[in-house]
């Protein structure tokens, strides 16, 4: 390691080594559309049930008439300073895509980029151990991985899962009159930006961390409810962005009750201090034309990029009570934030 490398692990603040943080690093939806617009002939496989033709959380491949294999990957730059916690959050976030399809994870492979001439290998080891801890909590092995020398720290997973095809849930299959439920509060981008701006109080340091380290394993149980018509997780594109994917995929309009959207404790206090991540502005610039007129305050909430955010569930009114009972049984507050309806205008989202 060069003389410029940091020698004291206690003095290292990982967020100072990255230009972005967590899922706020994601390329904006508008730019991503350009990147994915391939000029090559379309290759099809009848066994690929979910691929990049839709904007879903993971790919699903039909193994036989009963079982599908789920494949996903997710990685990002540090969103917290502590290496172990960073690894745990990154892994929890990556595994979430399996749960968001209604599946269960089977194994994971680590993805590591590390500035070897700036940060000690021992710090990278703590990051990987954090990822291993999240995998253990999900009941899977961290079975291998790949690493490169990179200018900024990067960590994540490629995760393989399985799904009973009868339980497969997608983000574009919602139906009119479905009710919308959210399983985690919004505000992770606001609180982590407060940390990066050195405004986060010590007593608030675990609020976002605790939310980001919570596995979305409830998704595998939610998927068994027949009246759940669509399922996705809320991550870097914010609540509005992922809700738009649900609406546009199913050609529906969402009636969103903004007052019902749950917020992390102290999120509004830090928002008032100007703790708005750059990803919020990129998100709004990408899809704001599909939203109703919003105040700056409303934009900051709806477009706030989440890292390891909660699940967004579209459920029929007939199955709503079953979903509520399931969430209550797992100590998850059931919060209905709106509903879906047949469009009467070009608006994808309206506030009610």
Swiss-Prot record:
Keywords from the UniProt entry = ATP-binding, Kinase, Magnesium, Metal-binding, Nucleotide-binding, Selenium, Transferase
EC number(s): the record gives 2.7.9.3
Site described as Important for catalytic activity, located at 26
Its Gene Ontology molecular function terms? ATP binding; magnesium ion binding; selenide, water dikinase activity
UniProt-recorded name of the protein: Selenide, water dikinase
Check the record and name the PANTHER family matching this protein. INACTIVE SELENIDE, WATER DIKINASE-LIKE PROTEIN-RELATED (PTHR10256:SF0), SELENIDE, WATER DIKINASE (PTHR10256)
Q: Which reaction does it catalyse?
A: hydrogenselenide + ATP + H2O = selenophosphate + AMP + phosphate + 2 H(+)
Q: Name one GO biological process term.
A: selenocysteine biosynthetic process
Concerning SUPFAM superfamilies, the annotation shows: PurM C-terminal domain-like, PurM N-terminal domain-like
**One Pfam family from the UniProt entry?**
AIRS
């Amino acid at each position: 390691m060069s003389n410029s490398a940091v020698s004291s692990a206690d003095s290292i603040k990982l967020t100072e080594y990255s230009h972005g943080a967590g899922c706020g690093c994601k390329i904006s939806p508008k730019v991503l559309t350009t990147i994915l617009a391939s000029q090559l002939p379309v290759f099809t496989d009848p066994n690929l049930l979910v691929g990049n033709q839709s904007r879903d959380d993971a790919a699903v491949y039909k193994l036989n008439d009963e079982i599908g294999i789920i494949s996903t990957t997710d990685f990002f730059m540090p969103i917290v300073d502590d290496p172990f916690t960073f690894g745990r959050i990154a892994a929890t976030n990556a595994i979430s895509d399996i749960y968001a399809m209604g599946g269960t994870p089977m194994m994971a492979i680590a993805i590591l980029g590390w500035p070897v001439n700036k940060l000690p290998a021992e710090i990278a080891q703590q990051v990987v151990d954090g990822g291993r801890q999240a995998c253990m909590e999900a009941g899977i092995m961290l079975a291998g991985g790949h690493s490169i020398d990179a200018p900024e720290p990067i960590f994540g997973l490629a995760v393989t899962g399985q799904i009973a095809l009868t339980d497969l849930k997608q983000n574009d299959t919602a139906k009119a009159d479905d009710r919308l439920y959210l399983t985690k509060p919004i505000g992770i981008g606001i609180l982590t930006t407060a940390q990066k701006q050195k405004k986060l109080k010590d007593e608030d340091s675990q609020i976002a961390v605790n939310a980001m380290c919570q596995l979305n394993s409830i998704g595998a149980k939610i998927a068994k409810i027949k009246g759940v018509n669509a399922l996705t997780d809320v991550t870097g594109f914010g609540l509005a962005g992922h809700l738009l994917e649900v609406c546009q995929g199913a050609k529906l309009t969402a009636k969103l009750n903004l007052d019902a959207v749950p917020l992390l404790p102290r999120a509004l206090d830090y928002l008032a201090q100007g703790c708005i991540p750059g990803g919020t502005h990129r998100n709004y610039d990408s899809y704001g034309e599909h939203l109703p007129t919003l105040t700056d305050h409303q934009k900051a909430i709806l477009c706030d990029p989440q890292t390891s955010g909660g699940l967004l569930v579209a459920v029929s009114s007939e199955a709503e009570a079953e979903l509520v009972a399931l969430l209550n049984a797992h100590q998850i507050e059931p919060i209905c934030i709106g509903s879906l309806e047949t469009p009467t205008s070009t608006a994808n989202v309206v506030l009610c």
